[in-house]
Design a protein with these regions (language model features):
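Low-complexity, disordered linker/stalk regions enriched in Pro/Thr/Ser/Gly
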Residues: 1-230
Length: 230
């Protein structure tokens, strides 16, 4: 018997069986193959038959000759892989520094240092064939997890990662939104007369890419979510 295709596949595989009736030891002519009974019970007349499967395993075919004798052929199929691989990824400091690593998905991630992608994948069948990532509206790009993408330019970007296995199955896409902002915020001020002889300090700030998170006043109090303060 033969199995087609004979390489890893994520689709069905066809078992092709051919049978012969050997010459008896007593010298008489063999009676010839009458039929082949398929694993699902279907009887096919003649000495050849095909059977399609979608799951790995052992499949039994019963060969019957015209004399009523039978033999069982055990056909092995082990190259079907219909399971999707899995992938996870996160970002780590490019310099290997001791910083908090974000592993959860779903929230925008803020970084003020160069980062490198850390991706890992798993597959229960044919094995991982390739890793791919996409930044923003860009094209899918193949990468080596041993030499992963690095991000050193300031940007706000949506990163998506997926993997393929040898059989052609693709994983669920995993995504992260990152803000890479390495520029410290700047501030400027003006002075204007206030009440009771006091002076107002009018503070304006620029938070570059990610904006200003907070302003700490001289007395230690903190104002959140503003970029100007009097």
């Amino acid at each position: 018997y033969t199995v087609t295709p004979d390489i890893w596949t994520n689709g069905p595989a066809a078992i092709h069986v051919t049978a012969t009736d050997p010459e008896p030891e007593d010298g008489y002519a063999p009676s010839g193959v009458k039929s082949i009974t398929l694993p699902d019970g279907t009887v096919v007349d003649g000495d050849a038959a095909d059977f399609t499967v979608s799951v790995n395993g052992t499949y039994d075919f019963i060969i019957t000759d015209n004399g009523g004798n039978t033999a069982t052929l055990h056909a092995e199929v082990g190259n079907v892989d219909a399971a999707r691989p899995t992938v996870d990824f996160h970002f780590e400091p490019l310099d290997g520094g001791d910083r908090t690593i974000i592993t959860e998905y779903g929230k925008t991630e803020y970084y003020n240092y160069d980062i490198i992608m850390n991706a890992s994948a798993g597959d229960v069948g044919s094995g991982i064939e390739r890793y791919e990532y996409k930044a923003g509206d860009g094209e899918w790009t193949v990468f080596d997890p041993a030499d992963p993408p690095k991000f050193t330019e300031e940007q706000i970007v949506h990163i998506v990662v997926r993997v393929w296995d040898v059989a052609g199955n693709v994983s669920e896409e995993k995504a992260r939104d990152i803000v890479l902002d390495k520029t410290p915020p700047t501030a400027s001020h003006t002075l204007t007369p206030g009440k009771d002889g006091k002076v107002n300090i009018n503070l304006g700030t620029d938070g570059s890419i990610c904006g200003v998170q907070s302003i700490t006043r001289p007395d230690g109090s903190v104002a959140y979510g503003v970029d100007t303060l009097v």
